[in-house]
Amino acid sequence: MAVTKTHPIKSTLKAAIDYICNPEKTDGKLLVSSYGCAAETADIEFSWTRRHAIDKGTNLGRHLIQAFQPGEVTPEQAHEIGMELAKEILGGKYEFVLTTHIDKDHVHNHLIFNAVSFADHKHYHSNKRSYHDIRRTSDRLCKEHGLSVIIPGQDKGKSYIEHQAMQNGTSSVSYTHLRAHETL
């Protein structure tokens, strides 16, 4: 199961790339990949592409996070899925840096990509449709790799605290579910 979220990078591209490439989080940079640029100079290369853009937009790049359920995926498998996701959603038209972080209890990918295509110099349009395409693609790739997928609406109506308690098995609802299954 992977959860995805995305946000724009408006002014701190180099800092964001430096953060995701941190060797302490990426197994000594073994879990760092890039496309169309070098991770070490990606901010400069993104800027060069942006200078040639027809429609620059206001964003320097986009930051996508893909987080996996604890214990469900190896760092290498997560990185492979992240690379497949990046290539599919960006269609080989945008420079990107992909890293896999292993510093938390869950493995997660960070993908920073240029807001301008090096192929046609057009601006990436982020909206609900593009986000849902990212999520659908991520879910499909997770299924193809034998991972679980979040069922839409599964957690609808639960507060954050109830969701966390369910995850930890400490909520009254999870206790009731457990007792019901034990009696069957």
Residue ranges and their predicted role:
Residues 1-179:
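N-terminal nicking endonuclease/strand-transfer module with a His-rich metal-binding environment
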Residues 180-184:
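A short, hydrophobic C-terminal helix/tail in secreted or cell-surface proteins
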